[in-house]
Amino acid sequence: LIPSVEMVKFAKNGSTVTTAALKIARAYTGRKYIARCYDHPFFSYDDWFIGDTPLTRGIPEEYHSLTLNFRYNDIASLQQLFDQYPDQIAGVILEPATGSHPENNFLHQVRDLCHRNRALFILDEMITGFRWHLQGAQTYYNVEPDLCTFGKGMANGFSVAAVAGKREYMNVGGIKESGAERVFLTSTTHGAEMCGMGAF
């Protein structure tokens, strides 16, 4: 259905799959820093994101220091991070759009900057997926991510989400991964519940 997607892993909520995407990026690249778009309001309840908000109580400072911020439609702010942290950024995560459309091929510039620096380009399509276009905002804006995440409109409100992308990256968390330690991506008490998958 979606050209960039060669492999999918399902979960129950968006926080789980955005965090899974970052685990894949870190495991694949061997790097620790994540760059996230500061202008997009929510990516996850996990420490990598909440530790970078005012609600840091209970989260060690080390988590905050590993998340870097750039601004939407400001490619210079992302370039500055790559200059400041050369060969250290594992992945860049952002929503394709929220209140503003990407200007001056911003998403394409982000993708190209990621690839020049050997970082993974991750689109969080929790809101835009199956809404901007049946194949996601990535098709609407004609840009192909390395990894992407979906939820919300995916099953009309039922509890199901997905991390998806190129097999080369997704295999890092695959059960058939050999020759390297497998990345533990997702698990949940209610993982076997199938109503959400049925709705999808």
Kindly label every feature range from the protein language model.
Residues 1-200:
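Conserved N-terminal phosphate-binding loop of PLP-dependent enzymes in the Aspartate aminotransferase
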